[in-house]
């Protein structure tokens, strides 16, 4: 019998993992405060193999050893990697330092279970070493524990991470822990700070220059002449093998030539496998321009156009950089960012008074401003201190902490820091004392400062992200202001986690994100904010658009469609007002939590017009209201064209949803047949005039697998092994069911059992490539595009 008594949510995870205990890898996501160490030890006990536990810090190493000694005092523990015991605990850094001595270390010492604590750190070069060691120890089993999987890592980093940790098997959600009163509820707010007119001008000039370059690329006589001389253009039937193997390049050439008034010969239509009058050739897109010039740069880099691109910075060090990102001059916007922080602090101070326990975090210290350097365009810990100490009320206690120094008020110094007087340094900081931090006193000074914040003797603490990292904990924090740069999803979650510990009844933490906004630019095209919003969309929280719901997704931030100066100011002002309503938001969390028991992961499929489509609107009504428009109203308002167009769209959408429903049911039935799902796991499908949704209620691993298969089946068509055709529509046969023809036939049989008539095509031969081309062309000429999004909803 285990010596550890688990909480309900921990027991749920252990129960769900029972069927995975023999897998090569187990991967658990759990927020700070959920007891990842306890979960890890429970699994170590169940696995019963010689174990190596790797952690990213000495602090966590000590924590693991203390937990083991408390619950299992009889277990033999080693801290020496090269002299392992039944349980060995060490750091990733130490493992890496001994890499030359570890060639067959796991096999030679019989290590069978590897625990990777805080596994999100494995984006670093440690992962390459561990992957190599894991491949040599074929019997090795891994357990990855993390609060913050690197969801926004690039494709290569994420691939390496998953190769080592395996796919996520189970997740303990923040909402579960709030429901169990282990963590405190919170509310995320975005403060929109419009950039300066100078920055707006720079961005406008960037967009204008980009448009000029694109216009230049879309019509180049030398490019036209070169393409017309190629055999795959003037004799395509002789070059079908080249065309089918390089279809993206071929298609981009055709789209380009079409805009030069080139008339496609019958041979091209034969290669494309469609009749001339059955398709309207689409315009060039960003992707087609990239495909075209990447192809040309490979075969004729001497073209004059590439000298032009080099001058414009779109070709650098022999690499094309088409559509480069806007190089942001953050310095010009520093005064507005500082003003935003000051505004938030003053408001939160007025709302909470002495109950304020706020942490303001930056990336940089900028200590030189304490010595008198002009701070107007400096952004960091020290400049924020100098401005805020003049703004806050006399009774608000302010402190600053970073790796180099601590600043506290004279009153706090006299009552709590007299024993550290030897570290005092003379600085002209009226009313405040500067203490130098050293390796000798750092941990003590930080611990005492944290204690004073926890007890409200300090109300506002300014610090660096690097010092107040994932090991820092102060339960009393009720306001977090993220003054740092956008950072990664991992860093964002770690910072947010500083404010989620419970510290009494009805605590709710306000978490502020500051975003520089370019007025009149769509949200998705914002140079700075788009990346921040993407990270925030992964985070669950209260969605107050209608009734209170806990969900992920950008919708919960209720951002305005039009980001002009007026709406930017109104949005921010509304957030500042709502930040006052802590008690109301606490009750809304309670209401939302009562509506469910777990965080489900439904998929939502929506059709949206492509960006190039022109939206027709009349003064009488907009398309948003077309559901309420009947035939007589349409006639009276002169909108019959839109009425019939919308009616046709809805009819087509409902037919498509009926097919989707049967395809989803097919996948569900196949997973039942394989034993991946059980009959007790329900499938829920729903749709309306604008969206289609589906979900199963199962373990994280099962839900994720199901969603991935649906996305593969219904998503965008790239280069699948097998294609599925139902009437005129094409779908991808998921890789799980397209390893060979036998697997495909099983998939096809399951589809026919749902009452659908379907054909399949192997895309690696000529006839299959033709079908793939048709599928891609259908997608290109479609007026709408499908968005498939996974959201998490408490239900």
Explain the meaning of each model-derived region.
Residues 498-529:
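Conserved segment of the helicase C-terminal RecA-like domain
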Residues 22-43:
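Walker A/P-loop
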Residues 1-29:
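Conserved pre-motif I regulatory segment
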Residues 462, 467-485, 509-513:
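A short beta-strand element within the Helicase C-terminal
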Residues 216-267, 528-743, 750-760, 764:
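Long, largely alpha-helical accessory region at the distal end of helicase-like NTP-driven motors
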Residues 124-183:
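Post-DEXD/H (motif II) to motif III coupling segment of the RecA-like Helicase ATP-binding lobe
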Residues 81-110, 124, 128, 467:
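Conserved helix/coil segment N-terminal to the catalytic DExD/H
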Residues 31-34, 38, 55, 62, ...:
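Conserved C-terminal RecA-like helicase domain
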